[in-house]
């Protein structure tokens, strides 16, 4: 079964182009994005959501995504993307980049 997370990732057109190029080279990353919901409001920007995903650092596709975000951060391009991961445990929330720049935020609620 494994530990599951919900993950949102949004980016500028520049970062989307990089992702599309890397997907052409790497079938694991391409499959990761094919499994995501594409929520982009326009064709240029990137906006994806993975629900109930195994977001393990040991998986090759996740390693590529993590490396891409690290490169963007080290290049001071952290405002070119935003990522939020919410794990199963209440306090397991991870953010990278600048999610607020893409109107991304965490909202926990109970519907009865």
Which sequence ranges carry the predicted segments?
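Short, extreme N-terminal segment that most often corresponds to the first beta-strand
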Residues: 1-23
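Charged interaction segments
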Residues: 21-112
């Amino acid at each position: 079964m494994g530990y599951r997370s919900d993950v949102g990732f949004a980016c500028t057109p520049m970062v989307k182009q990089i992702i599309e190029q890397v997907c052409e080279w790497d079938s694991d990353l391409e499959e990761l994005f094919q499994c995501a919901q594409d929520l982009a409001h326009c064709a240029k920007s990137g906006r994806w959501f993975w629900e109930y995903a195994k977001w393990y650092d040991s998986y090759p596709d996740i390693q590529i995504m993590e490396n891409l975000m690290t490169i963007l951060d080290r290049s001071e391009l952290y405002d070119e993307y935003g990522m939020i991961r919410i794990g199963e445990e209440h306090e397991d929330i991870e953010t990278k980049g600048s999610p607020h720049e893409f109107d991304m935020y965490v909202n926990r609620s109970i519907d009865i």
